Regions:
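Periplasmic-binding protein-like
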Residues: 106-116, 192-223, 227, 231, ...
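Bacterial N-terminal signal peptides
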Residues: 6-16
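Sec/Tat signal peptide C-region and signal peptidase I cleavage site
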Residues: 17-21
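Secondary-structure end/capping motifs
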Residues: 222-306
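Short, glycine-/small- and polar/acidic-enriched structural segments
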Residues: 23-175, 179-185, 196-201, 207
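Conserved C-terminal helix/tail region of periplasmic/extracytoplasmic solute-binding proteins
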Residues: 293-326
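Phosphate/pyrophosphate-binding betaalpha-module
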Residues: 189
Length: 326
């Protein structure tokens, strides 16, 4: 009996130890979305409303943050535990000494492109030569323009590029003062719904990463269970959303009815464009969020070419797949 009692005691201690080992380190985490909460970030709201973040052992608070640099600033200041910067913005910050890693890239392809007026002789990208194109200097869509031009045999020097602010760009375009503009592609269905006679060229996958869940090295090291549970729940959520896009849109607008447009089909089309960039060749094989060295090295080159940054670190210093489903 004494032997059995000792065995049972040992087993209970082992089980207790295992249970303790799997206890999340945090009671709540705050996660920054890459933009304000709206159609382009609807999947975060849907994931929460659908229950993917329940039973994790901690609360998940999603906040909208306007842009990549603001995401990094919030992460650096501790306003959020995890953020969603663009990969090249993160690489620039890492080159400047900020130690953080991307742990799930959920935008591995650009959500950007060129929108143009129909009836102005633009049928292919080559027709942009000689036309007036509005851009916001330093924006992702502007930085990718040379790649888009090169792939399509277009000379950027032959395009009449006009640099404007976001506050002015759309107005000038829809007033007809510009032939085309670089923009966030999911806006296109809304433009069409509003009656604008426009079309677009969407940027292709140029081999660089965009937005992804990112944490400081310190936070990732101190909270591995919390991070792993959140990331894997997010993977499951994104997979479900991708397969159930109409239901996902309905869930989002039930929570945010003030954002619904008069043309609900445009809402569906907008979300479809957002979700079309969630998977690349790597993530289709391995799962949403997965990254590899090759694409990160191209992201490094893009960063050096556009941000006057010197990449003095390895790919293992800026990303990891360890928290993803294996």
């Amino acid at each position: 009996m004494k032997i059995i009692s000792n065995i049972l005691l040992t087993l209970s201690l082992i089980l207790a130890g295992l249970a303790h080992a799997e206890t999340p380190e945090k009671k709540m985490i705050t996660v920054g979305a890459q933009w304000k909460i709206g159609p382009s970030t609807a999947y975060w709201i849907v994931a929460k409303e659908k229950g993917f973040f329940e039973n994790l052992g901690f609360e998940v608070n999603i906040v909208g943050i306007m842009g990549s640099q603001a995401n990094l600033s919030a992460l650096q200041s501790g306003q959020v535990d995890l953020a969603s910067p663009q990969a090249f913005t993160l690489a620039k910050a890492r080159a400047e000494g900020f130690k953080a890693k991307m742990i799930m890239c959920y935008v591995p392809k650009p959500q950007l492109g060129v929108v143009y007026h129909r009836g102005r002789g633009i049928k292919s990208p080559l027709d942009l030569e000689g036309k007036t194109l509005g851009i916001v200097a330093g924006s992702g869509e502007a930085l990718l323009l040379p790649m888009f031009a090169k792939v399509n045999g277009v000379s950027v020097e032959k395009i009449k590029v006009t640099q404007l602010s976001y506050g002015v760009l759309n107005g000038m375009f829809f007033e007809g003062k510009l032939d085309a503009m670089t923009t966030f592609m999911p806006y296109l269905p809304r433009f069409l719904s509003d009656g604008h006679k426009v079309a677009a060229f969407q940027y292709e996958d140029y081999g660089i990463y965009f937005n992804g869940i990112t944490g400081t090295e310190k936070f990732l090291k101190e909270n591995p269970i919390t991070v792993r549970r959140f990331v894997r729940a997010t993977q499951k959520a994104f997979d479900w959303i991708y397969e159930n896009q109409k239901e996902a849109v309905d869930i989002f607008y039930k929570v945010q009815p003030e954002l619904i447009s008069d043309d609900h089909q445009a809402d569906y089309d907008q979300f479809k464009l957002v979700m079309s960039t969630q998977y690349d060749d790597i993530s289709r094989k391995k799962g949403v969020g997965w990254m590899n060295d090759s694409k990160w090295k191209k992201t490094f080159k893009f960063t050096e070419d556009n941000f006057d940054s010197k990449i003095n670190f390895s790919t293992s210093d800026i990303y990891t797949n360890e928290f993803l489903r294996q």
